[in-house]
């Protein structure tokens, strides 16, 4: 029987430099969700353009910039997963008023597209 090792890594998933390429079978993560107000500060601290876009009521740009930050996480996950490995992402969509517009910010679709663009596949529900 093949021995497996379970290890929990807590830290910034944008840089998993201590983790070898193609060495992880399962990644479970719950990132901050773009366009949920409680996470605005975390995103804005990483890219000042986000706070500027939010102040200008530019939801589309804010959403895009936040997802650009998360793309670094998705790229690292793709790098460390073994072929056939699984990325389990807890994803929440956002509904929010920006200026006079109330809308859905579809985080799920954006994140799934990022993984598919990185060559991964979506599992059925």
Residue ranges of each PLM-predicted region?
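S-adenosyl-L-methionine-dependent nucleic acid methyltransferase catalytic domains
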Residues: 1-125
